[in-house]
Amino acid sequence: MITFSNPWIGVIIPCIIIFTLSTFSAIYILPHHVSNNELTLFICASAMVWISYIIAIIVPPGSPPKNYTPPENGMKMYCLKCKAYKPERTHHSKALGVCVLKMDHHCPWTNNTVGHRNMPHFMRFLVWVDMTVGYLFIRLCIRIMKLWRDKHLPSYLFDKTEVILSIVFLPASFFVLFTVGILTIRVFVNMCNGITQIESWECDRIESLVRRKIVTEERAEFPYDIELFTNIFNAVGSPLTFWLPWGQPRGDGITFEKNESGYTEEGEPLCWPPDHVDYDPENVPLQNLKDGLRRRGEEPDCLLGGIGAGKMQAENDFYKRDHWRNVEGEKLADFGVEHTDI
């Protein structure tokens, strides 16, 4: 995760880029080559970039209620920083110092943590940037090709300011479109699968446990993947309200619908990730690792592969959530999570 000595530097940089590309293009480049209606649409789209960006910065991601108590038959996650229980899919944000409902990641470019409540605003910002900069990039490509075709004409026929800005803005707009586009695709794909970036990392960790026969393949299935459109609507709300600056996600960020892999044959909810063990803050862990697995209807020898006690401890330490890295070298802390939960 990118970090800055002053976190607001991460906000100032996009502001400079957005202002420079949108303002100078609207004043010096586009008026000479597009209709007034097209220019007006570009200005409106640029305004929506600013509006969605400001909202993504100031709207909090959502935190659990102070009086939250876990259901008796559900998983019990406890935050040592907040000294309180928290709902499933909730993590403690190191930057904000609070637990965040359905936390996705901490974004240095908004200086805000993306969670259940502000995910639609964050996604709206990405989409408006992609559309606005994508349009500008196409227009710049057309303009540069025309300038190349007319390169033999006298220089006094060209507006030098426009030519210089077009040449500079072409690679700049491509860079913005490429980088933001990759992030948009990543977030959208996760959204389609009903998963957050943190949970995607978690799935990679669980898959490594399956390969080492530390976790059974059945228990590795992700329980929150319901159906394509249900997943999308749960994350960003109705497609009719998504384009509105105040559009909200579905649900409360505390309880979530699960697929069949999230329940036992008797209909009891299963914990995910599967190596989670409940914790009692008043005493000691409610169960040790094996007892916790049995409580969830699993046989420890099946889950832990029948390895010896010493090797089991070494394997367990290596695959702990605060130690493990994926193939890209990312740790849980790289998503802005302060690992204080048990």
UniProtKB/Swiss-Prot annotation:
Main location: endoplasmic reticulum
Entry keywords, A to Z: Acyltransferase, Endoplasmic reticulum, Lipoprotein, Membrane, Palmitate, Transferase, Transmembrane, Transmembrane helix
E.C. number(s) listed in UniProt: 2.3.1.225
Domain of life: Eukaryota
Limits of the DHHC domain: 77-127
Keyword Lipoprotein in record: yes
Gene Ontology, cellular component aspect: endoplasmic reticulum; endoplasmic reticulum membrane; Golgi apparatus
GO molecular function, one term: protein-cysteine S-palmitoyltransferase activity
Entries under InterPro entries matching the protein: Palmitoyltrfase_DHHC, PFA4, PFA4/ZDH16/20/ERF2-like
Substrates-to-products reaction catalysed: L-cysteinyl-[protein] + hexadecanoyl-CoA = S-hexadecanoyl-L-cysteinyl-[protein] + CoA
Coiled coil spans: none
PANTHER family reported for this sequence: PALMITOYLTRANSFERASE ZDHHC16
HAMAP family: DHHC_PAT_PFA4
Entry protein name: Palmitoyltransferase PFA4
Natural source organism: Yarrowia lipolytica (strain CLIB 122 / E 150)
Upper lineage: Eukaryota, Fungi, Dikarya, Ascomycota, Saccharomycotina
